[in-house]
């Protein structure tokens, strides 16, 4: 019995670990297109705020630990390109462009979310970044250090945007925030939102 999981982020690895605990003889394979698994994504803004900390401090468990200690076949750098439910197979491609097909008895899709980027001119220019994965966190931290960044603009006012604003201010980087909606912090109670706005 082969349990195949597409996506090695929090949901995918939790499912893989739980499946092995309940059925130790189950063959569990996880396909992750990035090089990173099992890291504290919520800690990225706080890590970026501290220039003395390595972004690698956020890694909770390396891929080889899942293989050696839990018997989970975790393959990184492999992207699923198509699924054929009729024959229960997933076609993939690795970073070198090599194709490979995986068979499954049960398939779980856990690819995670992708950041929304507005369709505006210049969105693909150097220095325009998103924060979703550990690779994004690495790139942001490296860019700040390499270019001695002193001013940034953040599009959005969700939780991560606000945490990044605070993190950048900790590093003495000026921040302008652009809100896509007319109301300030629409997901927050109005009186509290006004208090946050007054103190910002």
What are these regions (language model features)?
Residues 159-165:
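Mid-domain beta-loop-alpha active-site segment that forms a flexible
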Residues 121, 130-133, 161, 189, ...:
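Short, conserved glycine- and acidic-residue-centered signature motifs
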Residues 31, 77-79, 131, 157, ...:
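Conserved beta-strand termini and adjacent loop/short-helix elements that scaffold enzyme active sites
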Residues 1-4, 24, 60, 64-151:
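FAD-binding core/adjacent interface of flavoenzyme oxidoreductases
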Residues 1-73, 165-191:
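Beta1-alpha1 glycine-rich phosphate/pyrophosphate-binding loop at the start
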Residues 7-11, 132-133, 155-158:
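Glycine-rich Rossmann-fold phosphate-binding loop(s) that bind the pyrophosphate
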């Amino acid at each position: 019995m082969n349990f195949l999981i597409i996506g090695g982020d929090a949901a995918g690895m939790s499912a893989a670990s739980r499946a092995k605990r309940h059925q130790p003889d189950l063959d569990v394979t996880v396909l992750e297109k990035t090089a990173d698994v099992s890291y504290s994504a919520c800690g990225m803004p706080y890590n970026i705020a501290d220039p003395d900390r390595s972004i690698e401090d956020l890694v909770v468990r390396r891929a080889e630990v899942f293989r050696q200690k839990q018997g989970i076949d975790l393959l990184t750098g492999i992207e699923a390109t198509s699924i054929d439910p009729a024959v229960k197979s997933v076609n993939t491609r690795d970073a070198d462009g090599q194709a490979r097909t995986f068979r499954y008895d049960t398939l779980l899709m856990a690819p995670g979310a992708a950041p929304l980027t507005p369709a505006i001119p210049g969105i693909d220019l150097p220095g325009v970044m998103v924060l979703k994965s550990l690779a994004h966190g690495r790139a942001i931290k490296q860019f700040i250090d390499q270019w001695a960044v002193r001013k940034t603009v953040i599009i959005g006012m969700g939780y991560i945007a606000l945490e990044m604003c605070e993190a950048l201010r900790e590093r003495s980087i000026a921040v302008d925030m652009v809100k896509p909606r007319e109301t300030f912090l629409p997901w927050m109670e109005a009186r509290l939102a006004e208090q946050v706005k007054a103190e910002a």
